[in-house]
């Protein structure tokens, strides 16, 4: 049986290309639900995508991977690297992320999280249905597009687990963890 995944898609030209790229590695492993939004989507940001991920988790009473077409709205050089990171992590280490959220406690797992402010770097994560219920209670429109990455899990009282440097107390340590992964993966110095 495949794990569940919700992929949020911003329907820009770049977003549709990224969707195709991501589906190539997601569909063999996951039962993917697509949620698409018309650009510019500068009012709801990730809200419709995360809402659907929560609903899928609750309906099926099982963990769900939430991802989005990183780089569709504000393309830059780092975003293809993040997508490569997601591809590696969420295909090669699927069971680690899904096993980390077993249980009744509201849990989310991601490659890199900050422990003091439980953010999920790049906002790709696996959540269980308990977390989904708590997130739905707090989910609303926010003017700050980064609320979904930087505040949502904290305000929802969701415990986070990061596979890399889960004790990162600040963004700099978490970023160094990501750079270390990139360096070892691609031999970049």
Predicted regions: what they are:
Residues 1-189:
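ER/Golgi luminal nucleotide-sugar-dependent glycosyltransferases, focusing on the catalytic module
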């Amino acid at each position: 049986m495949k794990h569940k995944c919700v992929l949020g898609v911003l329907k820009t030209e770049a977003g549709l290309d990224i969707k195709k790229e991501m589906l190539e590695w997601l569909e063999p492993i996951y039962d993917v639900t697509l949620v698409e939004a018309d650009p510019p989507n500068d009012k709801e940001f990730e809200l419709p995508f995360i809402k659907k991920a929560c609903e899928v988790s609750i309906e099926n009473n099982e963990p769900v991977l939430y991802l989005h077409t990183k780089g569709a709205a504000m393309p830059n050089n780092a975003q293809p690297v993040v997508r490569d990171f997601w591809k590696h992590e969420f295909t090669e280490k699927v069971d680690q992320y899904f096993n980390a959220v077993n249980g009744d406690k509201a849990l989310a797992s991601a490659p890199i999280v900050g422990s003091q402010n439980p953010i999920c770097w790049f906002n790709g994560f696996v959540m269980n249905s308990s977390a989904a219920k708590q997130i739905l209670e707090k989910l609303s429109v926010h003017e700050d597009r980064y609320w979904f990455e930087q505040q949502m899990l904290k305000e929802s009282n969701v415990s986070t687990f990061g596979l890399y440097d889960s004790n990162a107390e600040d963004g700099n340590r978490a970023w160094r963890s990501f750079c270390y992964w990139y360096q070892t993966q691609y031999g970049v110095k």
